[in-house]
Each structure stands twice: as C-alpha cells, then as structure tokens.
Amino acid sequence: MIIVTGGAGFIGSNIVKSLNDIGYRDILVVDNLKDGTKFVNLVDLDIADYVDKEDFVASIVAGDDLGDIEAVFHEGACSSTTEWDGKYMMDNNYQYSKDVLHYCLDRSIPFLYASSAATYGGRNDNFIEDRQYEQPLNVYGYSKFLFDQYVREILPEAESQICGFRYFNVYGPREGHKGSMASVAFHLNNQINQGENPKLFSGSENFKRDFIYVGDVAAVNLWFWQNGVSGIFNCGTGRAESFQAVADATLAFHNKGGVEYIEFPEKLKGRYQAYTQADLTNLRAAGYDKPFKTVAEGVAEYMTWLNRTV
C-alpha cells in the first residue's frame, strides 16, 4: 500500500493520478474533507481507502500497524501563505510532519514530503538548498523551513529514504478548491470565461516566478521514490517566467480579450515573492534529467483540461 496525505488536495491528487498511471491502485488517501468540494479531485482516480487526517494522526501516534506500506507521500499541510495563525500552522505543517516522519523511520518506510520555495523568503537570486539562503517571509514558509531543518539533523543517521521537495509556483489540474490560493492561470481562465478581461497587477512583466506544471511535480516525486534518493531538493523548472507570460498563454488559448492591469495591494507589499527561480544543480546531480514544461506548454495543456466541459 502507498499512503498519500493531502491526497484529495492539489499536488496529492496529482500524485495519486500518476501512481494510477503506472498501475498502482492500493492507495490510502489521508485528508480533511471538511471542504467537501475537494472530493472532485478524486472522482476519476482509483484508491483503496480514505482516512480522515485526525484519525490517521491518532493511529500513527499510537503506533498502529497499518499494514505493508511501500511509501508515504506527505503532501498534507496548510498551504495558505496568508494564514497567520501560527499555532494552527505549526500543528498542521510541523508537528504533523514530524509524527509521520518518525512513523516511517521506525518502520523503514520511504518518506517523501512537500517543502516549499517559501523557505527562501524575499530573495531574488541564489535559490539554493542551503541554510544561508533561507529566510522565510511568513509563518507558512517558517513552518516548512523548520521541518527542513529538523530533517537535516536526522538525514545523516536515517536508515530509510527521506526526501523533501521545495515546490516553486505549481499550477495545473485539480487546484480549483484552493480559491484565492489557486494559480494565476486558474484565475485568469475563470475571468475570461465570465466575460471579463484577465487582471494582473501593474508591473507584472517584472514579476517573475518559476512556474512548474503539476504533472512535472508528480513525475519528480515518483522518480525519487523509485530511485531511493534522499535529501532536500528544489522542485521547479530552473526558469523564471513572468506573470505576463502566463496571461499571454491563457489569452492565446481563448483567442479573445486583453489584460487589465490593477494596482498592487498594500497588504502584500514586503510579503510577496516578486522573483523565484529554482537552482536545479542538486536535483540534476541526483540523477533527475527529465525536461520541464515551459509556461507556454504547461498553460496550454492546463487550459485544455480546464475547458474540457465548458
């Protein structure tokens, strides 16, 4: 059996899909379906069982035998960069991750988990997996950073796989439940379908992010599991592309409308990553040599998926 925490969420459900694609059906999804809309991410996927996150935590803390587990993909977390309840964030992202990690270590189960480029904070270069480059801007980034630090202490002595991925700006299918935290491509598509012009912040040609297609993220996860590689790795494309490029690709698909520029919100100033670009040196050195989709390629594929029933 393979366990995917956050399996009804964005990246988790895409990992389930990729596992299905290579023949895995014996999958336990762990999630919190208080937001019932997330069920749509699983309706076309095959899983063996579903367990509520709170019940799962109780089981692993109690040391229950969950059977023969081939791997745990730990994607379950609060991913809102605008959430400032630090206790909630640390319980969900830090303590929960430690509990799952130790369950896996005690049983030699491969543990692959979601970190984040938010660990780097507001820097505009040297996105390198090293302490000197890490200074998160928000409590979400801090919770991810602190768990990475915890893992770093354990890695040298670990006798089973521990692998963390610092996801950069992920977009693609199965993110609709994320609301305001969904990708720019998702929101631009909605605006066009509602008859509006797509909206970007003024200066968006200068805001550049490393946008990575979720299918590529899932492929990275599966490759590292199948190859038993441990460590903490950036998971981006190695390219910084502008929000304008995302809008251009969205408009190219719809072949209508033009961008409307709006003022940058005061509340985001100083807490906003204006630039991200993954350094892939360590990822490539580990042996992962597959190409990553460009924004033009990934957004075109995503638009086809989003508009398949529109």
Swiss-Prot record:
GO terms for molecular function: ADP-glyceromanno-heptose 6-epimerase activity; NADP binding. It is an enzyme of class 5 (isomerase). Keywords: Carbohydrate metabolism, Isomerase, NADP. The active site is at Y140, K178. Homopentamer. Contains a large N-terminal NADP-binding domain, and a smaller C-terminal substrate-binding domain. Catalyzes the interconversion between ADP-D-glycero-beta-D-manno-heptose and ADP-L-glycero-beta-D-manno-heptose via an epimerization at carbon 6 of the heptose. InterPro entries: Epimerase_deHydtase (IPR001509), Heptose_epim (IPR011912), NAD(P)-bd_dom_sf (IPR036291). It catalyses: ADP-D-glycero-beta-D-manno-heptose = ADP-L-glycero-beta-D-manno-heptose. SUPFAM superfamilies: NAD(P)-binding Rossmann-fold domains. Pathway: Nucleotide-sugar biosynthesis; ADP-L-glycero-beta-D-manno-heptose biosynthesis; ADP-L-glycero-beta-D-manno-heptose from D-glycero-beta-D-manno-heptose 7-phosphate: step 4/4. Belongs to the NAD(P)-dependent epimerase/dehydratase family. HldD subfamily. NADP(+) binds at residues 10-11, 31-32, 38, 53, 75-79, 92, 144, 170, 178. Its cofactor is NADP(+). It holds the Pfam family Epimerase. Its EC number is 5.1.3.20. The lineage of its organism: Bacteria, Pseudomonadati, Pseudomonadota, Gammaproteobacteria, Enterobacterales. Substrate binds at N169, S180, H187, F201, S202, G203, S204, R209, Y272. This is ADP-L-glycero-D-manno-heptose-6-epimerase. Binds 1 NADP(+) per subunit. GO terms for biological process: ADP-L-glycero-beta-D-manno-heptose biosynthetic process; carbohydrate metabolic process.
